[in-house]
């Protein structure tokens, strides 16, 4: 498909909050795409475009739909999982194919097991599954390895050129696909009061999400996952030192594990074509086996 494919930007009431999302029309089953901490659904755009019109694609935005302070423990991922289950229920979508990245992968897993999100298949890209002993620890923001950095994140640029120079200078963005980098510049930043640009997902909101990551242990849920699962791990991911995704795959009854060559933790941003092809193959196989 070409870049002419564009989603509708919609909002869904889930009872005590509203979640904005991108909706791509399609003729087939629903694919739910859930992003990583601090990012946004627009970064799925090349992948969503590749899935339509064979699939209907829904990509929600989880940043600030709930108020949470990082100093008070942040936003519990168990709460996010419940929100995702209600979001799908309110939209009337069930037995969905789900792809989550990082936070999105973990939240998706919790939503499936704890809140009954009906899924036909899960693709978990670099899920955040910390060592079990870290869950339940009450960390201060300055002691959390990710929240402490997020809350200090650079959050001001004079214009798009200034912002792009900054992004291109940072190791985090160095291997991103060019289209996705421009999508981040366009949708991941917004005008600030001083007429410059700032991050759409405020650093305090991002830090609150990171703080919430240690409040619920997802490991005991893995043996209860009932659908086929594919875990994708970046070959060069910096998560490898503390996240054992082979162990996670072994704990899930119908899971397989696959390495994405040349990718770091941000697999969808660095290898969108590989991810899109993998999703089409995995979801297509599930459809063929059920027909």
Regions found by a protein language model. Give the residues of each.
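The conserved beta1-alpha1 loop
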Residues: 32-36, 101, 233
């Amino acid at each position: 498909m070409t870049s002419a494919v564009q989603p509708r930007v919609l909002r869904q009431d889930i009872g005590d909050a509203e979640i904005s999302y991108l909706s791509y029309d399609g003729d087939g089953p629903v694919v739910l795409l859930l992003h990583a901490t601090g990012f946004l659904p627009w970064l799925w755009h090349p992948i969503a475009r590749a899935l339509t019109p064979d699939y209907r694609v829904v990509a929600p935005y989880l940043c600030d739909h709930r108020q949470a302070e990082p100093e008070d423990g942040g936003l519990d991922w168990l709460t996010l999982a419940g929100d995702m289950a209600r979001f799908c229920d309110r939209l009337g979508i069930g037995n969905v194919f789900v792809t989550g990245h990082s936070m999105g992968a973990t939240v998706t897993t919790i939503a499936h097991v704890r809140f009954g999100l009906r899924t036909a298949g899960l693709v978990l890209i670099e899920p955040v599954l910390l060592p079990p002993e870290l869950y339940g620890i009450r960390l201060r923001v300055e002691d959390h390895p990710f929240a402490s950095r997020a809350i200090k994140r650079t959050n001001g640029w004079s214009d798009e050129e200034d912002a792009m120079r900054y992004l291109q200078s940072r190791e985090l963005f160095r291997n991103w696909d060019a289209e996705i980098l421009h999508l981040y510049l366009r949708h991941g930043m917004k005008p600030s009061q001083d007429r410059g640009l700032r991050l759409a997902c405020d650093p305090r909101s991002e830090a609150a999400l990171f703080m919430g990551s240690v409040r619920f242990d997802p490991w005991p849920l893995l043996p209860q996952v009932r659908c086929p699962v594919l875990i994708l791990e970046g070959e060069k991911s910096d998560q490898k030192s503390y996240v054992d995704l082979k162990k996670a795959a072994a704990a899930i009854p119908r899971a397989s594990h696959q390495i994405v060559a040349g990718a770091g933790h941000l697999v969808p941003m660095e290898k969108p074509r590989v991810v899109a092809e993998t999703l089409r193959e995995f979801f297509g196989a599930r459809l063929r086996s059920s027909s």
